[in-house]
Swiss-Prot record:
This is 3-demethoxyubiquinol 3-hydroxylase. CDD domains: DMQH (cd01042). Binds 2 iron ions per subunit. Fe cation 2 binds at E94, E146, E178, H181. One of its GO terms (biological process) is ubiquinone biosynthetic process. The lineage of its organism: Bacteria, Pseudomonadati, Pseudomonadota, Gammaproteobacteria, Pseudomonadales. Pathway: Cofactor biosynthesis; ubiquinone biosynthesis. Its EC number is 1.14.99.60.
Length: 215
């Protein structure tokens, strides 16, 4: 029977650095699942449509960068091994989303946000602090964040042109995954944040969406 490997603090820091590089460098993320867009037909989009869709996908890509950083920060400071493993597993699934969004952005002749390193650092710090408070708060933060992501995905799905089936397929699968992450975090004992905290998180999310739509 295989034994679980135990990492030293230095090992974990090196793994965090490697994850950050793979998250932020172009074409670095290797998805474990093929993009849902592969089987969808190409759409005849005009320049304005393509630019708008690229902006939406750039927002979603940065959202996944933030989620990846959040999970990594929480995994670094989580107190219970099972919580740490849950964070690391969720982060692995976010790699798929990162790769899918970047692929679609490139197909639309655009680029990920130049602000990604800033948002990664901020999200990592928030995740690490949440993990230091307690695993219950950490898991609750995951649930609240993923619910916020689901709201953004719903809004973006409404804005997509009907003919853009590639982007739609990606966002619909992401929506399914993110909802599962939120429910799993709550089932694991995550704290349900009160409305004022969720409102504050939504304001921060708006800063991210407004700034990354174009850059």
């Amino acid at each position: 029977m295989a034994t679980e490997r135990h990492y030293s603090p230095l090992d974990r820091l090196l793994l965090q650095a490697d994850t950050a590089m793979r998250t932020l460098l172009p074409f670095s993320g290797q998805p474990t699942r093929p993009s849902p867009a592969i089987v969808q037909p190409d759409a005849d989009l005009d320049e304005q449509q393509a630019r708008h869709i690229a902006g939406l996908m750039r927002i979603n890509h940065t959202g996944e960068v933030c989620a990846q950083a959040l999970y990594q920060g929480q995994a670094l400071t989580a107190k219970l091994p099972e919580v740490r493993k849950a964070m690391e597993h969720a982060a692995e699934e976010e790699v798929d989303h990162l790769a899918w969004c970047e692929q679609r952005i490139r197909q639309l002749n655009s680029h990920p946000s130049v602000l990604n390193p800033l948002f990664y650092g901020m999200s990592f710090g928030i995740g690490a602090l949440a993990g230091l408070v307690s695993d219950k708060v950490s898991l609750g933060f995951v649930a609240a964040t993923e619910h916020q992501v689901c709201k953004h995905l719903d809004e973006h799905l409404e804005q997509l042109p009907h003919e853009d089936e590639k982007s739609r397929a990606i966002l619909e699968q992401m929506r399914i995954d993110e909802e599962q992450h939120a429910e799993s975090a709550l089932e694991a004992g995550g704290y349900r944040f009160p409305a004022p905290v969720r409102f504050g998180m939504s304001l921060l999310a708006k800063v991210m969406t407004k700034s990354t739509y174009r850059i």
